[in-house]
Amino acid sequence: MNYLKLVHLFLAVTMMGTVMISCVKKEAPVRFAIASDFHAPDVPGGKERVETFIKAASDENVDFIIELGDFCRLDSASQVYRDVWNSFKGEKHHAIGNHDLDRYSVDEYVVGMGMPNRYYSFDKGNFHFVVLDGNNYSDGEEIHHYDHANYGKYPLSNHSYMDKEQMEWLEKDLASTDLKTVLLSHQSLE
């Protein structure tokens, strides 16, 4: 089986699982498709990977799609991947991954991808979704945001921190809702 077929199989089986969340029978389910680490401009068949995801999400008639980072660059050569992503007719969301900031500041990436902020929340059905940004590293004294691949000079044990500002925002955001909450992030939350 060639690499492209393996990528498509991987997408179909693991990355493209449409997630249905419903805890009480009376509630309408919220259906969304989630993907991460497309690395679209850097892998063979990057455009086809995104197209496969969008087609599957459209076929499943999901309420929204979200990618959890390491998607594509903001340069004109990567516009094709953003166009495929934006071809989805429904609601679309992004989280920022570490490699999304290899060439950009967080502000450049947020604006370039049309995100409301580097972390944000939204409600869908009876659920509250929180998109977090774990793209921070510690230099041993302070927490700094990733910016133009600056995270590479520190060991992995110093990566993936949530900054104080974001944690304070998260505390207020969670206190403001009674809905069941789903946290989404490129990095693991430990």
Predicted segments with their positions:
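N-terminal active-site segment of His-dependent metallophosphoesterases
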Residues: S22-V80, E165
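Glycine-rich phosphate-binding loop signature in dinucleotide/nucleotide-binding domains
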Residues: A57-N61, D173-D178
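Active-site-proximal beta-strand elements of phosphoester/diester hydrolases
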Residues: P29-D42, N126-G140, L184
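Short acidic, glycine-rich surface-loop motifs adjacent to enzyme active sites
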Residues: L174-E190
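Bacterial N-terminal signal peptides
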Residues: H8-T18
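Positively charged n-region of N-terminal signal peptides that target proteins for export
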Residues: M1-V7
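Active-site neighborhood of phospho(di)ester-bond hydrolases with catalytic His/Asp-centered motifs
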Residues: I34-S36, F64-D70, K92-N98, V182-H186
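Extended active-site neighborhood of metal-dependent phosphoesterases/phosphodiesterases
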Residues: A77-T177
